[in-house]
């Protein structure tokens, strides 16, 4: 480790080392300060914490269990465990921060939640939270992802959300963020932009991390109860990086726990626009209101990106991940599309668990660690279930795995 981890991050300006901050138009500066003040007040409010704890237990179904994947473990020679965030209400980790953001918005007197979504999991979770607390909800989603993740689009609409297509650029997650931010600028007084990851201007990277830290806090206790010790390795996929920060946060000071973040290598790391491996190939820059590693084109603008996982195709990453990369605390690797799909089917057929394609990147990396000689324990954050992906996977990859499309 190059430097010791500073647990008191971010600082008051929202910086993790040199990354983070708040780069917003002047008309939003006071709004961001107000959100931060309201959040800090809620952190000290026993009623807020009690309400969130009650909903986590009785609405989400927490704590999510840890499962020993015995069949995969036997096959590959390492003890592979899964933190089952796929079993949460709405099917992923996103509900953890969406409930927090929704309750915060209600306490601030907001009328509407507004957000982007890639795979649709954040959108479904936010629409769910909005329905629960009685707020309107607008979700911006790339036109390509709307077609690809149709089941989640239907869920959002059933829950009462407006799903608004982003039709510019590559029509995926980055464009959805652009469209949501543009809409938010028009009326920041009555809306809360409920950012869907540990990205964006301060206080969102801190706030979303804090809400997601329940994953790691639970996992630390559960793993010790199951095995008598901490895991040798943690593995989680990284797009913006919320599920990963949720797991990693409880183990950052444990130097004997190796931590691995897994980025999407897409079709090729060698071609611009064919991957979204920000920490692997990016450089520091500013986009969407924060400084972090990002993938830039020749003009310094965000690169086009690709991943088979809609929730991972983002040209930047949470600022705390950038900091953890620079100090050497977390190793960031990558998994390509084909490896992720292989892991999608392998976990399904070896353990009876259909994972989200995003989470499949983490499963694939855990398998690769085992194949490379890791014989200790590997705890994978299974961040979501694959219901949303099954039609896309069968249509595009089914023949390779002996499945004919029924459509």
From Swiss-Prot:
Pathway(s) this gene product operates in, as recorded in its UniProt entry: Amino-acid biosynthesis; L-tryptophan biosynthesis; L-tryptophan from chorismate: step 5/5
Protein name according to UniProt: Tryptophan synthase beta chain 2
Function in brief: The beta subunit is responsible for the synthesis of L-tryptophan from indole and L-serine.
Gene: trpB2
Species the sequence originates in: Vibrio parahaemolyticus serotype O3:K6 (strain RIMD 2210633)
List of residues that carry N6-(pyridoxal phosphate)lysine: 94
Cofactor or coenzyme needed: pyridoxal 5'-phosphate
Known partners and oligomeric status: Tetramer of two alpha and two beta chains.
SUPFAM superfamilies, A to Z: Tryptophan synthase beta subunit-like PLP-dependent enzymes
GO cellular component term, pick one: cytoplasm
Alphabetical list of CDD domains matching this protein: Trp-synth_B (cd06446)
Pfam families attached to this UniProt entry: PALP
UniProt family annotation: Belongs to the TrpB family.
Entry-linked HAMAP family: Trp_synth_beta
EC number(s) stated in the UniProt entry for this protein: 4.2.1.20
């Amino acid at each position: 480790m190059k430097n010791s981890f500073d647990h008191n991050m971010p600082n008051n300006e929202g910086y993790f080392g040199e990354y983070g901050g708040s780069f917003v138009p002047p008309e939003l500066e006071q709004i961001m300060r107000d959100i931060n003040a309201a959040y800090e007040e809620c952190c000290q409010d026993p009623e807020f914490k009690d309400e969130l704890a009650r909903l986590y237990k009785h609405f989400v179904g927490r704590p999510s269990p840890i499962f020993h994947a015995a069949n995969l473990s036997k096959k590959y020679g390492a003890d592979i465990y899964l933190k089952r965030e796929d079993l949460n209400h709405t099917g992923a980790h996103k509900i953890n921060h969406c409930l927090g953001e929704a309750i915060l918005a209600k306490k601030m007197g907001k009328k509407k939640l507004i957000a982007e979504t890639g795979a649709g999991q954040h959108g479904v979770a936010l629409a769910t939270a909005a329905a629960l607390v009685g707020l309107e909800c607008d979700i911006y989603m790339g036109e390509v992802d709307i077609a690809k993740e149709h089941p989640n689009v239907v869920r959002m609409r059933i829950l009462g959300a407006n799903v608004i297509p982003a039709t510019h650029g590559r029509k995926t997650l980055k464009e959805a963020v652009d469209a949501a931010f543009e809409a938010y600028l028009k009326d920041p007084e009555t809306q809360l932009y409920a950012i869907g990851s540990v990205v964006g201007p301060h206080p969102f990277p801190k706030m979303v991390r804090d809400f997601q830290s329940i994953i790691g806090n639970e996992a630390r206790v559960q793993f010790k109860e199951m095995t008598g010790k901490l895991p040798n390795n943690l593995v989680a996929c990284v797009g913006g990086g919320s599920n990963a920060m949720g797991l990693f946060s409880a183990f950052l000071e444990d130097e004997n726990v190796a931590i691995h973040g897994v980025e999407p290598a897409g079709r090729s790391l060698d071609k611009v626009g064919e991957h979204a491996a920000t920490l692997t190939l990016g450089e520091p820059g500013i986009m969407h209101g924060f400084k972090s590693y990002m993938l830039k084109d020749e003009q310094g603008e965000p690169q086009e990106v690709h991943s088979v996982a809609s929730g991972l195709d983002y040209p930047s990453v949470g600022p705390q991940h950038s900091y953890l990369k620079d100090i050497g605390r977390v190793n960031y690797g990558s998994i390509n599309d084909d490896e992720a799909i292989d892991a999608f089917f392998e976990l399904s057929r070896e353990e009876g668990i259909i994972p989200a394609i995003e989470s499949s990147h983490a499963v694939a990396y855990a398998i690769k660690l085992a194949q490379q000689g890791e014989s200790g324990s590997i705890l994978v954050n299974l961040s979501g279930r694959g219901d949303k992906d099954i039609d896309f996977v069968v249509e595009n990859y089914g023949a390779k795995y002996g499945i004919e499309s029924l459509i």
